[in-house]
Amino acid sequence: MGTLKTGDEHIRFDGMPTGYLLSDFWRWSSSDLLDNTLRGTFSEFIVGTALDLDLTTGFENWLPWDLTYPFQWQDSLGQTYDEVRIEVKSASYIQPWEQEKLSNIVFSIRPTAKWEPDGRRSDQRQRQSDVYIFCLYAETNRRTADPLILDGWEFYIVPTWKLDEICGPQKTISLNSLRQLDPIRADYSGIQAAIVQCVQGDECTPPPGILHNFCAFCYVILVHYYKAARNGRAALFALYFRFFGRYDHEETS
């Protein structure tokens, strides 16, 4: 990306200023931070500032993941990495339009195909990051809602391996299901420490081999057992098909 604009640039026609600045366009197009698209981009900006990333390079929308945090860490197999790849997802109870009720909170966790160096899309679909940060704007009062006040945000940090193991190819996850994954929960001031904890701590580093798979199996057993207690036989059938048949299950709240 080229040099970042300041907002003071004139919009010109026939070599003359029209009387409008680039900042006028920004103000017109980007003031409603409750808009789904803008809220997603703003969430990435929030996380970037919390991690003290270099934001002078501008927003890049076509990378396989959203943000890269320079930090040296080691996985359970002893492989060392110099950065943490971060995927940022956002959701909000309130929307720009008039609502009869608050929105259900659902985040996208869809596996994606990345662009290869030759310009073609990879045939393999997977989650590309090391860590997911789920950003929830938790304000429910439209009259007082202001996404610029970061006290109103909640952040849930989950290692990607856990989504892969527990959710498989699932495309979305509800807030209730996300909380069952035992994420690291943080406010704005705790995002950086949560990322470090996630890649260094035992709860976010996958155990090796058989133990890893066994732990994931037990976790899903417990989740489905809990649902069976609430929902009856349907959840037991779901558990059966989860492990003994092809069953594409998307969790709901």
Language model: regions and residue ranges:
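Nucleic-acid endonuclease domains
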Residues: 1-84, 88-222, 253
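Exposed, low-complexity/repetitive linear segments and helix-based recognition motifs
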Residues: 41, 245-248
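Intrinsic-disorder-associated, low-complexity terminal segments enriched in Asp/Asn/His/Tyr and depleted
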Residues: 213, 224-226, 240, 248
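Acidic/polar hotspots within intrinsically disordered regions
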Residues: 219, 231, 247-249
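Positively charged N-terminal leader segments that act as targeting/secretion signals
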Residues: 227-237
